[in-house]
Amino acid sequence: MLIHQRTLQNEISLTGIGLHTGHECTITFKPAPVNTGYIFVRTDINDCPEIPALIDHVVDVLRGTTIGIGDVKVHTTEHVLAALYGLQIDNCRIELSGPEPPVLDGSSNPFAEALLSAGIAEQDEPKNYLVIDETIEFHNPEKSVDIVALPLDGFRMTVMVDYKNPALGSQHSGLFDLDKEFLREFSPCRTFCFLSEVEAMANQGIIKGADIDNAIVIVDKQLDETEVQTLADKVGVDASHLVLGQNGILNNRELRFSNEPARHKLLDLLGDLALLGMPVKAQILAXRPGHASNVEFVKQLKKYADRNKLARQYQHEKKAGVIFDINAIQNILPHRYPFLLIDKIVEFKLDEKIVSIKNVTMNEPFFQGHFPGNPIMPGVLIIEAMAQTGGIMMLNGKENIKESVVFFMGIDKARFRKPVLPGDTLVIEAVMTNMRRTVCQFDAKAYVRGELVCEASLMATVMEKKN
């Protein structure tokens, strides 16, 4: 894979109609400095507001991915972003004279060809790859969607679609080399829908810019003349221009590839993956993906990336099975011996869950008085260990971590199930249940040899230290 970041040599523009809004728009791709990423700019609005193409800015996923900040939005970003991501361009300023990029032929190819004609320039800064070193999974059982990222020193993507619709059936496609395959094998693949969906989408106020030249319509139902006329009126075309066809595609249009729908789903996933803000080294397997599931999957990748960033910041020596060792913990928490009551963090999902380990030894100072001849770890110190575990989850991500401290506001439903003795290993799991600004609630449980020994619900807040 490429080493250095890339941008454009020159700017280039394209003009056309937006797929869903139907508004005419000119899109202009411009070079951008290193570490800029992709930034959409609405030049048709006063002050030309900018919207970075990042997953946190996704506001809608109805038949496309829409990003926005406040009232300013950019619709259907996926084909543009797929072209940039597929050509491995890292930094680009994307100016729009309307709310939606032009659909053109319904694929990414016109954008990709335009970007190549503008020229690609290598930059001095190295690419910031997200390297996947563990399995990351997204599942939606209700929609039978599964997307998985696996460790790989490179990039591959495989997509399977199965609409349980005899007009399309099951298809799959795989991309194994961006350099060799993206431009010719995937960028030309057009957006598609089923004939049975067209009227409903028109009633939703979308596909205003769609026509038979920029979308594949798969015929999955037969229509009589009256129904054809009704459909034509809905989508604003002449009924004489609609032919159900003999090949299963409206107007007998030919597919560019036998599995073009599956390839287009892969293209959409590439475009949504670009919202991560960095290229990925991984093998990605996706069954029945769509924009909603793509976005949720990328959110999981972002949490993984944020966690890794924090781990690199505090954990200077990589250790198998350890996210933060005792040295990293002391860089995060202000506690010190004898009141630092956790030894390492072994699992960490940002803003979701954290698991710590506390090795309980006879050398603990509290065993001298609790109790002589019958040493038992005080329950309040188990609660404190839970609190410190949750505190790490709360403090991570704070830029001024050295100037922050966690204060506890409440302890509820505390239960002590079994005594903790010298030689035991406490495994403490804290799961965030609510986060509002600086106040966090989480449920904590402590285990010894797989048995629950203590549990409690805790509430805490992050505040700045007072001098």
UniProtKB/Swiss-Prot annotation:
GO terms for molecular function: (3R)-hydroxyacyl-[acyl-carrier-protein] dehydratase activity; metal ion binding; UDP-3-O-acyl-N-acetylglucosamine deacetylase activity. It catalyses: a UDP-3-O-[(3R)-3-hydroxyacyl]-N-acetyl-alpha-D-glucosamine + H2O = a UDP-3-O-[(3R)-3-hydroxyacyl]-alpha-D-glucosamine + acetate; a (3R)-hydroxyacyl-[ACP] = a (2E)-enoyl-[ACP] + H2O. Pathway: Glycolipid biosynthesis; lipid IV(A) biosynthesis; lipid IV(A) from (3R)-3-hydroxytetradecanoyl-[acyl-carrier-protein] and UDP-N-acetyl-alpha-D-glucosamine: step 2/6. Zn(2+) binds at H79, H264, D268. GO terms for biological process: fatty acid biosynthetic process; lipid A biosynthetic process. The keyword Cytoplasm applies. This is Bifunctional enzyme LpxC/FabZ. It comes from Chlorobaculum tepidum (strain ATCC 49652 / DSM 12025 / NBRC 103806 / TLS). The gene is lpxC/fabZ.
